[in-house]
Amino acid sequence: MTAPKPVVLCILDGWGLRAEREANAVALAETPTFDRLMATCPNATLVTHGPDVGLPRGQMGNSEVGHTNIGAGRVVAMDLGAIDLAIEEGSFPQNPALRDFIGKVKAKSGTAHLMGVVSDGGVHGHIQHLISAVEVLAGEGIPVVIHAITDGRDVAPTSAGEFVGQLVRVLPEGARIGTVIGRYWAMDRDKRWDRVKRASDAMLHATGEHAPDAEAAVAAALARGETDEFIAPTVVGDYAGARDGDGFFCLNFRADRAREILAGLAQPGFDAYDTGARPDWSAFLGMVDYSKEHDRFMTTAYPKPVIRNTLGEWVASHGLRQFRIAETEKYPHVTFFLNGGREAPETGEDRYMANSPKVATYDLQPEMSAPDVSDHLVEAIGAGYDLIVVNYANPDMVGHTGDLKAAMAAVEEVDRGLGRAVEAVTKAGGAMIVTADHGNCETMVDPETGGPHTAHTTNPVPVILVNGPAGARLHAGRLADLAPTLLQLMQLPQPEEMTGRSLIDA
């Protein structure tokens, strides 16, 4: 029996399952294609959080974690847990890159600027990592300025006051908060350089809103109608900007939303916007690798481990062709993260990126660029590829806005695209796995506060087999099991590095 061609992995980003219909965009939306597949095709559920994806117990998954595990075909120990462990066991203060940073800043009598997410969301950063770094640097007698990035997306939308207060209460002598900036400005990943400029101008030149202290900055933003994610870049107290000889340490451990701001702060030859005069940094450190380009001007505390024989690498090694498609917001996930942290395409790997719409928030355009993604997906299905990986961003990105009606519209647009994909795959004689990397839009109201729920969830996600082998059934599993499942459909052997198990029962 010949292998189906193409085999498609369709990732409905942020599409989780929850029994209750209330505030559940997936359940409340009109989804005829998804409903039909669930009723007629083999299906099961996957776990996308905690130890099953290499995270601490109870920690919700996210798109980086999800796509890394999917592409690896094994559970990958993620940075959050590794850094947590280093802090707990006491090795963090002796990290070689951190010691080098300390030495260089001291040699120039500089100030250490620390930028990090001030929340315990654990998706891009963690407040405890920031606190630990402040303690180490202040303990070395180095003045510390914190650039506090407020979250409101991976945690409750108006929780920044609590987190900033927690940080203020534990600051050692010699440490202070210099700026308070919502992640909307400091953590863009879609080349909205006007936002990034406002964040870097506050950090570098002390321009923006002003507040006497960090807690007042949060309160003033709330009074202006800004929830935590959108807090306008605010200069705290008499902070006067960065100077020659200062050092900069980015505490974020996820690459995609750190790259732009770091480039604006220090990348040689940067010209996306006018940065003004930038300081001659004595040291520029990142918690993790952000990209090969960033490695040219930064050092790294915790380099990424090499993941060998990812799904893409293994398929390429067998001389097969593959295609990756997503819109801007999720393009790094189906390329960089799915390929184990490598930017370059594999041999025979083609890509298409649809441009995400230039709107302030995606509830204003919940269809996003899904129609363009669907058009190119249908075209690729008929183009002779062996493997296609597609990501629909809408359920996650619109789910993050907390707008239930918009999330329902997003889900319905994705369902239309899914219908087109099913039709094209059937016509081509291919097979498809439909799944998600984590939940989000199935919970749009916070059950504890009654306010909008904007974060990911720990709910299970669906996995559906479309046009699979006759008599096939699926069993429950985790994201690491998807690559072995795809390889089974493609009739390829599984590399020994992949410890996941195919979800298909004959």
Swiss-Prot record:
<feature type="binding site">
    <location>
        <begin position="254"/>
        <end position="257"/>
    </location>
    <ligand>
        <name>substrate</name>
    </ligand>
</feature>
<dbReference type="Pfam" id="PF06415">
    <property type="entry name" value="iPGM_N"/>
</dbReference>
<comment type="pathway">
    <text>Carbohydrate degradation; glycolysis; pyruvate from D-glyceraldehyde 3-phosphate: step 3/5.</text>
</comment>
<feature type="binding site">
    <location>
        <position position="437"/>
    </location>
    <ligand>
        <name>Mn(2+) 2</name>
    </ligand>
</feature>
<keyword id="KW-0324">Glycolysis</keyword>
<feature type="binding site">
    <location>
        <position position="183"/>
    </location>
    <ligand>
        <name>substrate</name>
    </ligand>
</feature>
<feature type="binding site">
    <location>
        <position position="13"/>
    </location>
    <ligand>
        <name>Mn(2+) 2</name>
    </ligand>
</feature>
<keyword id="KW-0413">Isomerase</keyword>
<dbReference type="InterPro" id="IPR005995">
    <property type="entry name" value="Pgm_bpd_ind"/>
</dbReference>
<comment type="function">
    <text>Catalyzes the interconversion of 2-phosphoglycerate and 3-phosphoglycerate.</text>
</comment>
<dbReference type="InterPro" id="IPR011258">
    <property type="entry name" value="BPG-indep_PGM_N"/>
</dbReference>
<dbReference type="GO" id="GO:0005829">
    <property type="term" value="C:cytosol"/>
</dbReference>
<feature type="binding site">
    <location>
        <position position="124"/>
    </location>
    <ligand>
        <name>substrate</name>
    </ligand>
</feature>
<feature type="binding site">
    <location>
        <position position="400"/>
    </location>
    <ligand>
        <name>Mn(2+) 1</name>
    </ligand>
</feature>
<feature type="binding site">
    <location>
        <position position="189"/>
    </location>
    <ligand>
        <name>substrate</name>
    </ligand>
</feature>
<comment type="similarity">
    <text>Belongs to the BPG-independent phosphoglycerate mutase family.</text>
</comment>
<dbReference type="GO" id="GO:0006096">
    <property type="term" value="P:glycolytic process"/>
</dbReference>
<feature type="binding site">
    <location>
        <position position="63"/>
    </location>
    <ligand>
        <name>Mn(2+) 2</name>
    </ligand>
</feature>
<keyword id="KW-0464">Manganese</keyword>
<dbReference type="InterPro" id="IPR036646">
    <property type="entry name" value="PGAM_B_sf"/>
</dbReference>
<dbReference type="Pfam" id="PF01676">
    <property type="entry name" value="Metalloenzyme"/>
</dbReference>
<feature type="binding site">
    <location>
        <position position="396"/>
    </location>
    <ligand>
        <name>Mn(2+) 1</name>
    </ligand>
</feature>
<dbReference type="GO" id="GO:0030145">
    <property type="term" value="F:manganese ion binding"/>
</dbReference>
<dbReference type="GO" id="GO:0004619">
    <property type="term" value="F:phosphoglycerate mutase activity"/>
</dbReference>
<feature type="binding site">
    <location>
        <position position="456"/>
    </location>
    <ligand>
        <name>Mn(2+) 1</name>
    </ligand>
</feature>
<dbReference type="GO" id="GO:0006007">
    <property type="term" value="P:glucose catabolic process"/>
</dbReference>
<protein>
    <recommendedName>
        <fullName>2,3-bisphosphoglycerate-independent phosphoglycerate mutase</fullName>
        <ecNumber>5.4.2.12</ecNumber>
    </recommendedName>
</protein>
<feature type="binding site">
    <location>
        <begin position="153"/>
        <end position="154"/>
    </location>
    <ligand>
        <name>substrate</name>
    </ligand>
</feature>
<keyword id="KW-0479">Metal-binding</keyword>
<feature type="binding site">
    <location>
        <position position="438"/>
    </location>
    <ligand>
        <name>Mn(2+) 2</name>
    </ligand>
</feature>
<dbReference type="InterPro" id="IPR006124">
    <property type="entry name" value="Metalloenzyme"/>
</dbReference>
<comment type="subunit">
    <text>Monomer.</text>
</comment>
<dbReference type="InterPro" id="IPR017850">
    <property type="entry name" value="Alkaline_phosphatase_core_sf"/>
</dbReference>
<feature type="binding site">
    <location>
        <position position="330"/>
    </location>
    <ligand>
        <name>substrate</name>
    </ligand>
</feature>
<feature type="active site" description="Phosphoserine intermediate">
    <location>
        <position position="63"/>
    </location>
</feature>
